[in-house]
């Protein structure tokens, strides 16, 4: 039982690491590309073509993507990178490091993070673009008239107004990240063992529910892990939503206080005959 609890905590840690490691570069890259593609000052040749190409990985099945990267970067001697590495006289490189104690988590996790980022940044980019295009163009025109540079327009106009879309992306990505299963489960050369660095909570649930020996099936552990995963998702979702709402409320209160202060100042000047 203690082993099961340890495995669940390790799986939860792996899930968080894999999600954070692919969400941060994904959102940054998506924001950068969305700003570029929606900037009227930039004339990028073949803009529509690049949008389609960047979105394409999102429609490829996870099985196909995992098979592709196993052929490119894996422990298999037939993989492209290991083949080149061994042709230079080196021993086969352990990209997967399937056991925790081997200490090579960085490679396997890094590859899965890259795959997840590559698969999903196109979808996130489209959502960021839709959010930017939904902003009133007159705000950008006013900022340009006031002499704001590109960085100031981004930080003072685009990002604040894009925050609802970023929060929505964060919540949906967090839900998907906590349910991450396909790529971590499929990316391993040894078909008889799961990479311990990549065992997520969803894989933990599957392993305890689906075993070769039906006598050792642990439906209770699978059910409990599923409920815990659901509760964690709900709590984190509510936390992010409340944080965003509280930030909006704090901003509105600050604006109201400023208006009240200005009103009182004007009233005081009026009483003193200071209004011209």
Say what each PLM segment does:
Residues 1-270, 275-276:
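A structural signal for multi-pass alpha-helical bundles of membrane permease subunits
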């Amino acid at each position: 039982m203690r082993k099961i609890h340890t495995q669940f905590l390790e799986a939860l840690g792996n899930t968080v690491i894999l999600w954070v490691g692919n969400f941060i570069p994904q959102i940054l890259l998506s924001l950068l590309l969305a700003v570029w593609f929606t900037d009227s000052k930039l004339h990028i040749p073949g803009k529509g073509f690049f949008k389609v190409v960047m979105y394409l990985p999102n429609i490829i099945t996870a099985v196909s993507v995992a098979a592709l990267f196993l052929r490119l970067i894996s422990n298999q001697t037939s993989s492209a990178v290991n083949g080149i590495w061994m042709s230079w006289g080196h021993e086969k490189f352990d990209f997967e490091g399937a056991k925790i104690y081997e200490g090579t988590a960085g490679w396997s996790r890094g590859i899965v993070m890259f795959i997840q980022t590559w698969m999903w940044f196109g979808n996130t980019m489209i959502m960021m673009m839709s959010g930017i295009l939904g902003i009133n163009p007159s705000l950008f025109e006013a900022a340009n008239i006031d002499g704001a540079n590109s960085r100031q327009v981004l930080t003072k106009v685009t990002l604040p107004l894009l925050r609802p879309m970023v929060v929505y992306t964060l919540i949906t990505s967090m839900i998907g990240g906590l349910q991450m299963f396909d790529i971590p489960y499929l990316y391993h050369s040894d078909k008889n063992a799961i990479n311990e660095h990549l065992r997520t909570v969803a894989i933990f649930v599957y392993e305890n529910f689906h075993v070769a020996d039906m006598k050792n099936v642990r439906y209770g552990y699978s059910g409990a892990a599923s409920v815990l995963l659901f509760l964690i998702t709900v709590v984190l979702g509510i936390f992010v939503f409340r944080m965003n709402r509280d930030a909006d409320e704090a901003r509105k209160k600050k604006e109201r206080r400023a208006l009240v202060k200005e009103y009182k100042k004007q009233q005081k000047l009026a009483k003193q005959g200071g209004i011209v």
